[in-house]
């Protein structure tokens, strides 16, 4: 929490100063009210009138400060929330492929939405409120001290009580807050799963399952929030009662002081208001300190800050000789190996195919080459250097991976191909031609600027794969790994794409296919046929 407050210190400081000044002026209004009362008791009309005008001006200043505080607080919260999401994104980028896929995308979505909302409610808003409440307490105590020193003493004692009592409950709220965060992430993931399966459930008439699933996930989320709220508010109510008892004690002290002529009668009205402000402020500080404890689990999830712990900045050397797979074994489960003592060699500029039934390790091999699955036995050499010496990010500077299930961003075809980079018209035309996408664009009125829809649902499966191939080609990756990347294409377009890839002398191609004709096999330098849990040589 402190990290983000410091990061956005200009707007945080401006909002805090406005809040402090506003609450300080509110205490001044109580002192002015004491003087107004004294003017009435003395029958001094002039003093009464002047104090009334002063009171109105003071309240005007309070309102102006609060308006300014709202402006600066809104900017500060926006910047801190943006910083939170940047750090969450940086944390995801620092995960390995395996680490990232250990969690559902719904859980990550929950962090970017629910977690940020919870932090805003339990950390940012309470922080600014505490600044005002603390100012109210400090200025109130100073005002009470100016009236009589005994009021200062009792105020300090009560302040200590109100500060230390909430600490008794911080651990409990931290535990409840952690459970709430986990429940929300799980619920969002379940709702996302139901939304993704909407068509399947409707097709089989499972409307009730959709409704009940959403209801169950929603209730789980709300139950966790309810438990957190009950704990927070229950503790807050207890603290409010302690504050009320303290306030009554001060009223009793005021009565004793007035009855003994130690302070004027006029002070009773204003002093009561100041005391109420002090104890309400203390109560607020206590309750909000508890809120900070509940927000801690959300901050604990953020372990990386954007701009820190940068990845290695040196690039991957251009492939000179080739990639060698030596005696590689791998299994997601130790008892069920997928690859056993694999040996393969992929020369620079060569064209290779991997064939075999499902589950024999074809896709697994590509992911090992990409550095996504480092837990294998044996060696994978990139020009005689172990690929473990490189990060996946470095390997992907020279490699591109096209899989059967293509993901497209909800933007235009152009943006999905270029990913925001600038390319010449010649580069674009070549990528469109070599990917067999040019023919599709000719039938689209908006051409490259055609929106693809959410997850590319405005395009056919074959069109999406052609966009993915064009994306890989235009970014000039010299090593292309294709995992059934032409499976959704008709035979004519598949032939066009594969012919273009096979004819490119600068491209090292490793292509997965379940079925290859003898004619097509002859066009590859080597075809590796895999069988489940076997070796290839």
Locate the predicted segments by residue:
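An intracellular "coupling" helix at the cytosolic face of ABC transporter transmembrane type-1 domains
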Residues: 6, 97-98, 114-123, 127, ...
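Transmembrane helices of ABC transporter permease
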Residues: 7, 11-24, 55, 62, ...
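Transmembrane-helix motif of ABC transporter permease domains
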Residues: 10-29, 40-82, 266, 270
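ABC ATPase nucleotide-binding domain helical subdomain, centered on the C-loop/LSGGQ "ABC signature"
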Residues: 86, 379-381, 389, 396, ...
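Juxtamembrane loop-to-helix connectors within ABC transporter transmembrane domains
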Residues: 93-138
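Cytosolic ends of transmembrane helices, especially the final helix of ABC transmembrane type-1 domains
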Residues: 206, 230, 274-305, 314
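Helix-to-loop junction immediately C-terminal to a conserved catalytic motif
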Residues: 370
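ABC-family ATPase nucleotide-binding domain "signature/switch" substructure
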Residues: 405, 413-416, 450-537
